[in-house]
Amino acid sequence: MMCGLEIHVQLNTNSKLFCSCPTNYQSAPNNTNICPVCLNQPGAKPYPPNQAALDNAIKVALMLGCEISNEVIYFMRKHYDYPDLSSGYQRTSVPVGIKGELNGVRIHEIHVEEDPGQYKPDRGTVDFNRSGIPLIEIVTEPDMKSPEEARNFLNELIRVLNYSGSARGEGTMRADVNISIEGGKRAEVKNVNSIRGAYKVLKFELIRQKNILRRGGEVQQETRAYLESQMITVPMRLKEDADDYRYIPDPDLPPLKIDPAHVEEIRQNMPEPAHLKTERFVEEYGIDKKDAKVLTSELELADAFEEVCKEVDANVAARLMRDELKRVLHYNKIQYAESKITPSDIVELINLIESKQVTPEAAHKLIEQMPGNDKTPTEIGNEMDIIGVVEDDAIVNAINQAIEENPNAVEDYKNGKDNAVNFLVGQVMRLTRGKANAGETNKMIKEKLDQL
């Protein structure tokens, strides 16, 4: 199998690519964020390209390891007929970046283009609020050999885009999926709007094309549509070539030259790409690559990890942030940047655990109260009454009480049911308000029961 992707990503700008209309099309009533330029009305000339959009495109290209074009940048008219394209053509630039690489997949080119409107065939209406929103199209080489490789690439791309701050989010990403197998021609599946969808498309197309060849048929070069509700693809039309689009330079837009000094300024101010940060974390901090990928899943989380590592051991920090912190963030459905948990909070919690002021079990409960909380871990722990060292005598007394109050559990243990010990450990943790160490308590209970 050979798979290449054409990924369309909306850029994070306040205004459209060739006019000053706002870009908040998702929350606006239909056909309100429009002007004569958006609608390509006679006599309406486009503004010069939005500089913020061009800068965002350059930043993404740099973060994907692309060479920035030193050629003159033209905007071309790409002609095709569809209700969401009022002019009959789409403005798209020649490549801004070329020859990049991500996750072992070569990036052929990145260029800027305008989004068309939104056609609603069930109603026969078009909303032009989206028309003119700036996009980049990221075109890969056909380097992916399985649906899994394509899914991994897209996940990695999302991380890069999130780090860049240049994109409007995964929900605005659309991919055209190109797939062929040995002995067949290429099929293109248009406008797949999720990573899961791209994976399902490739799984379906792989089976469909193999079955055609197995029966002695011929796989057509065609454009197909993905029916998400049925998770299948269906024919749309025969695949177009570049000549079918009748590309010509747009006479209303002057050619552009990208200033190398401006590119260098963008390079100096952009964050370290996620995939490179992952590799550095492994080398610099000696942590596992899986942990590094979790910690670099958000730029702010990665920055927090580096701050925490200035105060505590990197592997200790990685374990707590990977397991406990990410668990709590996932449960609350928030990103680290939204949590109000600071690096100093994480350091304080780790120090409480390391000094045995709180047990791992108590810390498990404490961290659940930290998101959105302005109090320190120590203040939260004191309110929960889970901070403090329990003396051995107090633990022994709690063990004796748990055994005395639960004769059935004792009998179960004597009959070979080791899980009964876990129940008794839970009772001791309740009696000590979670201040006892579960592992040590488990060992002490077994020793006590074996003496009975």
UniProtKB/Swiss-Prot annotation:
Record field: catalytic activity: L-glutamyl-tRNA(Gln) + L-glutamine + ATP + H2O = L-glutaminyl-tRNA(Gln) + L-glutamate + ADP + phosphate + H(+); L-aspartyl-tRNA(Asn) + L-glutamine + ATP + H2O = L-asparaginyl-tRNA(Asn) + L-glutamate + ADP + phosphate + 2 H(+)
GO molecular function terms listed in the Swiss-Prot or TrEMBL record: asparaginyl-tRNA synthase (glutamine-hydrolyzing) activity; ATP binding; glutaminyl-tRNA synthase (glutamine-hydrolyzing) activity
Keyword terms: ATP-binding, Ligase, Nucleotide-binding, Protein biosynthesis
Alphabetized SMART domains for the sequence: GatB_Yqey
UniProt enzyme class: ligase
SUPFAM superfamilies: GatB/YqeY motif, Glutamine synthetase/guanido kinase
InterPro entries registered for this protein in UniProt: Asn/Gln-tRNA_amidoTrfase_suB/E (IPR017959), Asn/Gln-tRNA_Trfase_suB/E_cat (IPR006075), Asn/Gln_amidotransferase (IPR018027), Asn/Gln_tRNA_amidoTrase-B-like (IPR003789), GatB (IPR004413), GatB_C_1 (IPR042114), GatB_Yqey_C_2 (IPR023168), Gln-tRNA_amidoTrfase_suB_CS (IPR017958)
Gene Ontology annotations of biological process type: glutaminyl-tRNAGln biosynthesis via transamidation; translation
Pfam families in the record: GatB_N (PF02934), GatB_Yqey (PF02637)
Listed EC numbers: 6.3.5.-
Oligomeric and partner information: Heterotrimer of A, B and C subunits.
Matches recorded under PANTHER family: GLUTAMYL-TRNA GLN AMIDOTRANSFERASE SUBUNIT B MITOCHONDRIAL AND PROKARYOTIC PET112-RELATED, GLUTAMYL-TRNA(GLN) AMIDOTRANSFERASE SUBUNIT B, MITOCHONDRIAL
Annotated function: Allows the formation of correctly charged Asn-tRNA(Asn) or Gln-tRNA(Gln) through the transamidation of misacylated Asp-tRNA(Asn) or Glu-tRNA(Gln) in organisms which lack either or both of asparaginyl-tRNA or glutaminyl-tRNA synthetases. The reaction takes place in the presence of glutamine and ATP through an activated phospho-Asp-tRNA(Asn) or phospho-Glu-tRNA(Gln).
Sequence similarity: Belongs to the GatB/GatE family. GatB subfamily.
Protein name, per record: Aspartyl/glutamyl-tRNA(Asn/Gln) amidotransferase subunit B
Organism: Methanosphaera stadtmanae (strain ATCC 43021 / DSM 3091 / JCM 11832 / MCB-3)
